[in-house]
């Protein structure tokens, strides 16, 4: 089984860019950024429970990594960079730390490297469980209205919150809930040590108004690019700034 994706060809010999969206996003999320890099082939993946992969079930984080590997093989992608935001960034870090053939480098935007103690994991498990139950039972417009009130989204304007709530409410609540549980931060190991031992380039992007993830970026051995005039979702709030950073990273 493979994940649904959109593939855009590039020049032969250049590494591919594989884009992974955040929770409740889909393969379109990264396209305003990725389509500025026509020289590289681009693969925009729908993660399980999302978009064209909504019906693909997963029970564990390991299932997501297995599906990612199968998808890359199916597109014959042998040399690539992983670029992931939030949930997609965590998937990218997990894949990189477990070893994935052909990976040239890693770019993570606002992805958490992992909780560091069991109490924090237990608290997160309870929190994610409550959100999952709401996604299953309540109208998505109501759930996402509250979702975007979380502190990590504090930099959003009321208009931005309304737009995101309308966009994300097009998802399937049941499949979002299943993916949230399978990939909960509580189910992710602390990746700091493994990330610091990576043998290939690792870059971290974060919005200048995203104080939580700017602090987390200092805990991993990554070169950090701070995106001006942006909060947690930097590639949505300032796509040109993220394009500039990626161009520097990829030397394009």
Swiss-Prot record:
Pfam families recorded: Abhydrolase_6
Superkingdom to which the source organism belongs: Bacteria
Keyword tags: Lyase, Menaquinone biosynthesis
Pathway: Quinol/quinone metabolism; 1,4-dihydroxy-2-naphthoate biosynthesis; 1,4-dihydroxy-2-naphthoate from chorismate: step 3/7; Quinol/quinone metabolism; menaquinone biosynthesis
Gene Ontology molecular function terms on file: 2-succinyl-6-hydroxy-2,4-cyclohexadiene-1-carboxylate synthase activity
Lyase found in the keyword field: yes
One GO BP: menaquinone biosynthetic process
Enzyme class name: lyase
Coiled coil, from the record: none
InterPro entries in alphabetical order: AB_hydrolase_1, AB_hydrolase_fold, SHCHC_synthase_MenH
Catalysis performed (reactions): 5-enolpyruvoyl-6-hydroxy-2-succinyl-cyclohex-3-ene-1-carboxylate = (1R,6R)-6-hydroxy-2-succinyl-cyclohexa-2,4-diene-1-carboxylate + pyruvate
Summary of subunit composition and partner proteins: Monomer.
Family membership: Belongs to the AB hydrolase superfamily. MenH family.
Database matches in PANTHER family: 2-SUCCINYL-5-ENOLPYRUVYL-6-HYDROXY-3-CYCLOHEXENE-1-CARBOXYLATE SYNTHASE, PROTEIN PHYLLO, CHLOROPLASTIC
Primary role: Catalyzes a proton abstraction reaction that results in 2,5-elimination of pyruvate from 2-succinyl-5-enolpyruvyl-6-hydroxy-3-cyclohexene-1-carboxylate (SEPHCHC) and the formation of 2-succinyl-6-hydroxy-2,4-cyclohexadiene-1-carboxylate (SHCHC).
Name the UniProt record assigns to this protein: 2-succinyl-6-hydroxy-2,4-cyclohexadiene-1-carboxylate synthase
Taxonomic lineage from the root: Bacteria, Pseudomonadati, Pseudomonadota, Gammaproteobacteria, Enterobacterales
